Amino acid sequence: MLLLAECRDNGPRQFRLTLLLVGVLVTNVVHIPVAAQSQAILIRAGEIHTVTNGVITDGEILVRDGLIQQIGTSVDAPADAQEYQAEMVIPGMIDAHAHLGLDRSSRSRIPGPFTPEWKAVENLHLEDPMIQVALSGGVTSVIARSGSGIISSGQSVALKMKSTPGPSMILKPYVDLKMAVRPLINLRPGETPQTVMGWYATADDYFRQAKLYLAQKEAYTEGRASEPPEINERLEALLPVIRGDVMVHAHSHYPSEIMMVLRLARKYGFIERLALAHAEEVFPLIDLLSGTSIIPVIGPMMIVQYYNDPEPINLLKELLDAGITASIQTDMSNQHFKDFREYGAFLARHGLTDQQALEVMTINGAKAMMLDDRVGSIEVGKDADLVLLDGHFLDLTADRVERVFIDGQLEYERGEPEQGDRLRDVGPFSPLRNGIGPNDESFAITGAHVFTISDGAIEDATIIVEAGRFTRVEAGGTVPAGIPVMEAGGRVIMPGTIIARAFANDWIGDLKWQVQNDEITEPIVPEMNALYAVDPWFPSYRVNTTVGVTAINVTPGTLNLIGGNGVVVKTPGLDFEEMVRQEPSSMVMSLTSGTTSYWAGASGISVTLESASAMIRDELDEAVEYSRGDPDREYDQRHEAMLPVLRQEVPVLIHANRVAEIREAISIARDYGLRLVITGAVEAHKLADEIAAADAGVILGNSGSFASDIRGGGDGWSSKGPAILSQAGVKVAFFGPGASRRASPIGRLGGEPILNSVWAFRNGVPEIEALRMATMNPAEMLDIGNRVGSIEVGKDADFVVLEGHPFDYRVVPSHVFVDGRLEVERR
């Protein structure tokens, strides 16, 4: 029996769910009856992608009483059936690991080290606005779970996304047991084990006790014991795992961690009901997992690469090609990414078939919940969770989700699309003829469709490159005798993309490098230089080149109030000083609550926006005074670092998210005559006119780790932000991922500048302006627009060749040139 109670917790109204057991186990799937429909629903579509039984062309689906009743080219629908049309229908998509509707409680309120009795279903906030964001993107089911601070942080809940909060959202109250290996290391010393050895010993002992407890209960039930064991809530929570009613969802990253989880699962009988969360390094164990029912739930990092790996490893492709069921996860909490289908497009872009991409977004997630008999595919008898689209389910150039049905009820209906413009046509393409080699210093390309960025498009164009620069860009034209010529066959040529800001190191999975972005000995350190925080041998630089990134502005992080100088580098090479093109490129500062709260915790005193601004202003005042001093004054490293900013030789990048922070950044820049670029900028769209009046640029993002971090999300964020800002005359660009020895820059959605541009396009930014956000805008913000960012005579020959429009999810560069040298060639 499920009761819904309302309560007020000194804040917004929340729905909290309490389960009362009346003769049934909490592990039972909750079936809330769907109100009998007075009308059947008939859905007609050009294509119905069933996932499990192929594609039905010009098909129909009959829905009644919340279930799929018939599927085919012609169904027996009653005359009064309510009809809907769509170009394409797919099953509702499933996020197999998220935190929406919950806080990440295990790091704060859930005591360690092992608390399986904690119930997510009793801690739900079903009015979380991120539920509606997920729904609008076609996500119909989610596993909501607590965080990863302890060995087991309790029981996850499977939810259905609904437009109105209520008990029908509970798909399965106890869907899996959340466990975690690696994230607990160095967390809660004295409360949780600090080694994987301690993890195994602790988990093993609890499961041993639970197995004994179950035997005692069975002995009493069967009359072999006179007394039942004393009720133990913690051990009771493990019994559904041992009995096979729920999955175990274990966070495990390294192969050794995965092997340890497998050993525990074999010993206690849940090896066939095991999901491996994140599992970024599962690839050495693929042969071991093949043929089992273990389900890796990959993400948010989905592609990895290590030094000397010839190519990035698409984990989903490796797993699926080996016959292993694998799903994906967003790991979102206070944010949720609307365009869940973009994960599929991203994976298809890098090796999956469209069908495989659809499987990881639907049926495989259902299998990770042990609910594939109800959701995840379009089959007779299953829940009518359906997504109706006006184009291909992986097309990223528009918000394709028109309607979402859940349990046969229309839960979401899109209004007018944000983007009404069509992309310019490209193609058809004829075969490439002749070629250019990496040692050719001068060459020509003919028959190209050039997106100059600065001056429109040129069809049937000829490009001449000499000594690393463009010397001719024109329609038609002749080619000088004696130089190599590549006939492009109508292919698109555009400038290489530029990452406007990235940190020196991406800490994901590497404890050494997670402390390399911020010098946290004190809050004001302008003398720092990102040049010395980088290892150019990290494979991420090469991967960036392969996807068309030709320049990156590498900066310190965002923990310091003043963090130091950035540096612009070209992506190819191993000698970092040879890669440098602008040093310094920028000075970074931060006014965000994350920065102030960090220093408040470190100092034990209150640090507010006002006091942070005062500290920054004090340093600026001292630097101004220093700049006016005697030329023979005593050298001050800190003040010297500030001089290029004061002279307007480089911009100041001030990290500011909220309205008050952004206004203070504008005030600082105005008072000291600084050239301002606002980074982070979650609420910048609310101040578009003020930012434009300040002649400031905006770099959207709080890191390069996740698409949601780059594009915003959560409170105060708007997907229309880039359109609002650009309409006001503000230059917009994007953060990108930092370097890493293992986390590929294309490993997580959002790592490719061009995908951020297409996101801006489908949310209302004109095509050419969206392309500028990944090319010319960052170049101009960083004072390198005279060298890169567009295809113009005299500029560096940094460009890519594409067999299709750059916003087509299937199109990656076939050729990448940097400084006129061929760096990438895909055959």
Label each region the model flagged.
Residues 18-29:
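Bacterial N-terminal signal peptides
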Residues 1-15:
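N-terminal secretory signal peptides that target proteins for export/translocation
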Residues 105-106, 114-118, 247, 298-302, ...:
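His/Asp/Glu-enriched, well-ordered alpha-helical/loop segment
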